[in-house]
């Protein structure tokens, strides 16, 4: 099994934390759950941050059986749809944001 993590590093606009979570739950998470070959989808929200580290308000972890399954997910229509929503998501809810991806066993 491998897990692909999407880590949203940045600052949510003041007062937009609840709205950001609601948007993720209503718009992005249903798409992420449609990724081909996904075995488990976990969405996590930052609650407590290391004072010396970067702000991470949102993390996504999707687990696949293997790299072939992950490749199918990255080429699935739901992935492209969710990716196309990200610029508007960033503009609406973030002061600044960088999206990082890591694949872990």
Regions found by a protein language model. Name each.
Residues 59, 63-65:
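Active-site-adjacent beta-strand/loop module that shapes the phosphate/pyrophosphate-binding cleft
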Residues 1-2, 105:
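Surface-exposed beta-loop interaction hotspot
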Residues 2-11, 59:
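Active-site-flanking beta-strand signature of metal-NTP-handling nucleotidyl enzymes
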Residues 18, 65-77:
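Short amphipathic alpha-helices within nucleic acid-binding modules
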